[in-house]
Amino acid sequence: MQKIILVGKPNVGKSSLFNRLARQRIAITSEISGTTRDTNKAKIEVEGKDCLLIDSGGLDESSELFKNVKFKTLAEAKNSDIIIYMVDGKMAPSDEDRAIFYELCKLNLPIALVINKIDSKKDEQRAWEFINFGVKEIFEISVSHNTGIDELSQWIAGQLEDDVIKTDESEDFDDFLENFNDEGELESSENFEDRYIRVGIVGRVNVGKSSLLNALVKDARAVVSDIAGTTIDPVNEIYEHEGRIFEFVDTAGIRKRGKIEGIERYALNRTEKILENSDIALLVLDSSEPLTELDERIAGVANKFNLGMIIVLNKWDKSEREFDELVKEIKDRFKFLSYAPIISVSALGKKRIHKLYPLILEVYKNFTQKIQTSKLNEVIEEATKAHPIPREKGKSVKIYYAAQFGFAPPKIALIMNRPKCLHFSYKRYLINKLRQNFELSGVPIVLAPKKRGESDENEEQ
């Protein structure tokens, strides 16, 4: 699949054009310069031709962080097929604009100069100042008013070759993703074994989420910096490891509520959306610092989506605490995540990272498993005999049988005579019995007491 990359200085409208071409809001857009710091990718169709659209980080020489972004952007451009260089039509062309453009021209790829924010006759006159760039393909557009986009799309389609697929590792995954059934229907364990594993990396700012992503995929595509809050857009990496395909998403770092500005508030909402579409969450904690109330809140956000969960103690090489001591504190403070395994790593030092993949696979297997109905009912029957369900106002409360009605996580219906009378403490008792008898480490269990004939709604954990 051929690749199109959007390149330009911060705040020229690359993310807005990306969203327009992708026909959905994927990249965060804002008037704040430098909103996009990492690359976003989306498979799109232009005039009936499939291609991969890449929204690069803004190119700017004014900070150390953006020098890192520039290096990554130019490397990404070198591996693309078409370059769209965007400039701000409300600003006169600068020497920096020309320097970046000529550097891209050296790659000998089809390149178009796209002048955005042409919203008036005055803007059209100013656009003539860009004619001395010496490029034939110049497009005047206004993404906000949706003008000029059709002409640009037609030019892109003309550059795309028919039936050309590059032998790029990432493209091997596209056919796989196309065949993936994500309609929310109940799937068999066999289908789960074939599909890719979606892993969201969450935590407060500067705990090392981007470093962990880089260590996991052995590639430094996510921007890493000591500046708190470096990642704003969620960063996706699709990666194959020992025959399994993983999609890692490095979500935006979550700050204290009072410090969340508009752009980061939207990023927080995006984080929740990412988790909603994930299978497993890696909750990253900074083991070199005391646990905070914000760590607990973030854990609660991740927990509400009923994902597989792994707690990652990062920066372990800088920690002065004993592992067992910190684990005890986590289990005391995060009681609702008592089922989550805990692992210590050093992302920057790449220590113990290799132990994460087997752990992710183990949790995913538990997350998607189908429990044999006969064994499930044996465990429930033994549990109720050992500790009968308390009576309600003198009337007996019975479980007739149990049946699994969903996966990811395991969802189990308890068919009863009085489902509303099953106390939450007894449900917790049953969940503990299930954990003792089945491999359910790292996953929540949803128990849904129901009457005969009742639909699988109002699930309770």
UniProtKB/Swiss-Prot annotation:
SUPFAM superfamilies on file: P-loop containing nucleoside triphosphate hydrolases
Domain EngA-type G: 2-164, 197-368
Keywords recorded for this protein, A-Z: GTP-binding, Nucleotide-binding, Repeat, Ribosome biogenesis
One BP term from GO: ribosome biogenesis
InterPro entries, sorted: G_ENGA, GTP-bd, GTPase_Der, KH_dom-like, KH_dom-like_a/b, P-loop_NTPase, Small_GTP-bd
Sequence ranges assigned to domain KH-like in this UniProt record: 369-453
GO molecular function, one term: ribosome binding
Binding site for GTP 2: 203-210, 250-254, 314-317
Gene3D superfamilies named among the record's database cross-references: 3.30.300.20, P-loop containing nucleotide triphosphate hydrolases
Binding site for GTP 1: 8-15, 55-59, 116-119
Highest taxon, organism lineage: Bacteria
Family: Belongs to the TRAFAC class TrmE-Era-EngA-EngB-Septin-like GTPase superfamily. EngA (Der) GTPase family.
Function of the molecule: GTPase that plays an essential role in the late steps of ribosome biogenesis.
Subunit structure: Associates with the 50S ribosomal subunit.
Designated name of the protein: GTPase Der
